[in-house]
Amino acid sequence: MWIPWQDLSPVTLENLIESFVLREGTDYGEHERTLEQKVADVKRQLQCGEAVLVCSELHETVNIMPRSQFRE
């Protein structure tokens, strides 16, 4: 189930994004990026529709994924 990011409180959204970023590993590419930079990148992707929040009732989880991979 897709969850509009706008429906979440700012604190909840920030916590979800931070949790997602911290789970994604440590591939920094050429330059290491701060947690704040990574959170800002994900937030921008949610705001422009490149990424979506997805809730799995089966697994009782919320995840962030590229919109192109999301199937209802």
UniProtKB/Swiss-Prot annotation:
HAMAP family for the chain: UPF0270
Lineage: superkingdom: Bacteria
Family named by the database record: Belongs to the UPF0270 family.
Gene3D superfamilies, per the entry: YehU-like (1.10.10.610)
Name of protein: UPF0270 protein YheU
Cross-referenced InterPro entries: UPF0270, YehU-like_sf
